[in-house]
Amino acid sequence: EAGEECDCGTPANPCCDAATCKLRPGAQCAEGLCCDQCRFGDWNDDTCTGQSADCPRNGLYG
């Protein structure tokens, strides 16, 4: 929804502040195939580039 950076969820979420629906300090993401422990994963260029929590659209994955 407008103004939200992440899905509020529960207070136990280490990435997203449930009271504000904003990412916690130091977090880059709260969910997604390329989100690992609140950080963008950079496993390889075809799946996770380190720039987003989502896989890139490159013809192979989307």
Swiss-Prot record:
One GO cellular component, as annotated: extracellular region
SMART domains according to UniProt: DISIN
Subcellular location: Secreted
Molecular function as annotated in GO: toxin activity
Chief location category: secreted
Motif (Cell attachment site): 41-42
Protein keywords: Cell adhesion impairing toxin, Disulfide bond, Hemostasis impairing toxin, Platelet aggregation inhibiting toxin, Secreted, Toxin
Tissues and organs where the protein is expressed, per its UniProt entry: Expressed by the venom gland.
SUPFAM superfamilies referenced in this protein's UniProt entry, alphabetically: Blood coagulation inhibitor (disintegrin)
InterPro entries: Disintegrin_dom (IPR001762), Disintegrin_dom_sf (IPR036436)
Disulphide connectivity of cysteines: 6-21, 8-16, 15-38, 29-35, 34-48
Pfam families documented for this protein: Disintegrin
Residues covered by the Disintegrin domain: 1-62
Origin superkingdom: Eukaryota
Note: The disintegrin belongs to the medium disintegrin subfamily.
Family per record: Belongs to the venom metalloproteinase (M12B) family. P-II subfamily. P-IIa sub-subfamily.
Function recorded in the entry: Inhibits ADP- (IC(50)=63 nM) and collagen-induced (IC(50)=53 nM) aggregation of human platelets. In vitro, inhibits adhesion of endothelial cells to vitronectin, type-I collagen and, to a lower degree, fibronectin and laminin.
Name by which UniProt lists this protein: Disintegrin atropoimin
Native species: Metlapilcoatlus mexicanus (Central American jumping pitviper)
